């Protein structure tokens, strides 16, 4: 069992234990639980079982979905028409069109709202995401107020409300921290993307902050009403519990204020360091605040999840990068403000399409690590005489040299420093020590008879591995895919250099012409002479594509069930989403959008 799988199962075991333990009374351990404490216990249980129900529903959906994909793949290996799988379920098609794949309003989902070219204020959630967020937010609001005796005295009502909001804030820290990790087990088990879980993590954080603020204001209101402001100041000064409660709430408010999209995107590395520091302070403050309360056991679980996830990440980094001379990175400048980074791995791994990894380059950014799509992988044997004859499994692994490559576009921060260092190096290349963490993600599209891959600019790095995998599987007879179309939109023909060597390899693969068609669209050609089509299966056009027309054509000529995947700008993703949704009730087509946000 791999380290990642061990982490996934252990995280689930910890969470299951917390669901049964989280409903502890909210105070007065020496005096026994009050009726209000028991109500808080019940509400904590209800919230925990809501998590279980939601997660269980998605897991069941994924099991059914993967079973259907498996049956479809086996049934279509020798089926050239696949007509049975081309027809959609009318009810499920409508569900996808109007809910599962639908943006919140009309067509805009992934295209960012911007105050200027440098200030991004975020995107709109999808209809399904918004329904979940509203439902969970509403559930927390309801749980904050139900069963409270609103007819009681001011002090009694404030005390009940204070305890209720405090308990809910602590309980909600469990999913908040679980969803923050890169090794979140539910990405795999629920089939929910890291991008969506990141969105949920941010909103769970806002809920925790609001409940912490409500908890603090309820205490302040009760104290001031009873004994006045001077007594409040004295209580904060002389009570460690209250003082650290104030520190915790202040830390939560700071996290809320420094986390808007505009700040995260403009100053990501600075944001990340401040975020970790503020979260650490908030957790320490809450820990001390709960020192004599039963809810401290929930903080044991919260901190354990965070420490365990970080420990497993460290173990994974050591396993991937220690030995055989360590991991090295070859960085090469490419036309169009980009670099190719080839990571020569200390230890091999099994590469799958759709994966990404985090890279650390101390010589470029000492404390930073960034995620990038893995565009290519090569594996070769080290046949040097120094290695000698392989005598055991470890010798065999050491003789296998794996390299993974990625294309990184020049932006700001780390990518800017990386590009400049390569550009100033002799021949536009340099080699440095590096660490790689991963791989994360991965997706298999070989159960679809028709696959259409859309990419804009650097988004091609996500789609190239799928092209290679499907063409190889087609030649081996291990895929249902009979029609594969790659649509790549670039600004200049010089961007073709990013993947030229890889595409040369793909175009020379057996039976490539029988399955693969490539459409290139150059939006800003310098002259018409730059636009030429090498063959009927690789065609180049000036300008932007008509997304709806190309997808409609694919529907007319496609085979069996289809998948349309897009990785690129927000505008392209929204256009492709709209075109696919227009056909989901008449064509068995699934939509896949690859994006990475923070």
Q: Where would I find each of the regions flagged by the language model?
A:
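Membrane-proximal N-terminal segments immediately preceding the first transmembrane helix
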Residues: 17-38, 85-121, 137-152, 180-189, ...
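Hydrophobic alpha-helical cores of multi-pass transmembrane domains in eukaryotic membrane proteins
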Residues: 56-60, 130-145, 164-182, 200-221, ...
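Membrane-proximal cytosolic interface modules of multi-pass membrane proteins
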Residues: 264, 269, 273, 277-289, ...
């Amino acid at each position: 069992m791999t380290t990642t799988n061990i982490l996934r199962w252990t995280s689930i075991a910890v969470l299951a234990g917390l669901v049964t333990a989280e409903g502890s009374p909210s105070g007065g351990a020496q005096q026994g639980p009050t009726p209000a404490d028991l109500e808080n216990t019940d509400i904590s249980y209800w919230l925990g079982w809501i998590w279980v129900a939601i997660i269980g529903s998605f897991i069941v959906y994924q099991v059914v979905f993967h079973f259907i994909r498996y049956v479809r793949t086996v049934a279509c290996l020798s089926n050239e028409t696949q007509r049975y799988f081309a027809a959609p379920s009318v009810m499920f098609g409508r569900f996808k069109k109007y809910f599962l794949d639908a943006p919140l309003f009309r067509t805009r989902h992934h295209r960012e709202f911007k105050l200027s070219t440098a200030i991004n204020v975020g995107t709109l959630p999808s209809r399904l995401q918004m329904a979940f967020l509203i439902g969970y937010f509403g559930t927390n609001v309801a749980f904050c107020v139900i069963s409270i005796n609103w007819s009681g005295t001011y002090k009694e009502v404030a005390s009940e409300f204070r305890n209720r909001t405090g308990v809910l804030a602590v309980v909600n820290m469990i999913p908040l921290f679980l969803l923050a990790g890169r090794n979140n087990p539910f990405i795999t088990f629920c089939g929910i993307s890291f991008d969506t879980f990141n969105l949920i993590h941010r909103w769970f954080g806002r809920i925790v902050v609001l409940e912490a603020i409500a908890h603090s204001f309820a205490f302040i209101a009760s104290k001031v009403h009873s004994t006045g402001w001077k007594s409040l100041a004295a209580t904060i000064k002389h009570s460690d519990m209250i003082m650290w409660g104030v520190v915790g709430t202040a830390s939560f408010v700071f996290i809320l204020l420094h986390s808007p999209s505009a700040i995260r995107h403009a100053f990501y590395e600075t944001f990340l360091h401040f975020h970790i520091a503020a979260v650490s302070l908030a957790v320490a403050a809450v820990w001390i605040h709960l020192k004599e309360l039963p809810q401290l056991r929930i903080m044991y679980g919260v901190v354990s999840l965070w420490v365990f996830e970080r420990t497993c990440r460290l173990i994974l980094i050591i396993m991937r990068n220690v030995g055989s001379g360590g991991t090295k990175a070859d960085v090469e400048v490419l036309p169009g403000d980009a670099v190719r980074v080839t990571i020569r791995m200390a230890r091999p791994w099994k590469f799958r399409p759709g994966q990404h990894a985090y890279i650390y380059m101390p010589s470029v950014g000492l404390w930073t690590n960034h995620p990038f799509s893995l565009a290519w992988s090569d594996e070769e044997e080290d046949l040097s005489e120094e290695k000698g004859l392989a005598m055991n499994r470890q010798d065999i692994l050491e003789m296998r040299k794996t390299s993974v490559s990625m294309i990184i576009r020049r932006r700001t921060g780390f990518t800017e420093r990386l590009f400049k260092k390569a550009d100033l190096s002799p021949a536009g290349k340099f080699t440095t020590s590096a660490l790689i963490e991963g791989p994360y993600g991965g997706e298999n599209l070989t159960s679809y008879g028709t696959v259409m891959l859309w990419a804009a600019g650097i988004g091609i790095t996500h789609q190239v591995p799928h092209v290679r995998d499907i063409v190889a599987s087609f030649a081996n007879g291990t895929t249902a895919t009979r029609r594969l179309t790659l649509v790549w939109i670039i600004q200049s023909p010089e961007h073709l250099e990013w993947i030229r060597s890889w595409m040369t390899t793909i175009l020379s693969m057996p039976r490539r012409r029988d399955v693969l068609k490539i459409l290139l669209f150059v939006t800003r050609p310098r002259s018409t002479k730059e636009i030429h089509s090498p063959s009927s299966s690789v065609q180049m056009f000036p300008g932007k594509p008509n997304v709806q027309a190309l997808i409609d054509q694919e529907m007319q000529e496609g085979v069996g069930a289809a998948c349309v995947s897009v990785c690129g700008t927000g505008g392209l993703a929204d256009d492709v989403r709209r075109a696919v949704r227009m056909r989901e009730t008449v064509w068995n087509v699934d939509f896949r959008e690859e994006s990475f946000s923070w």
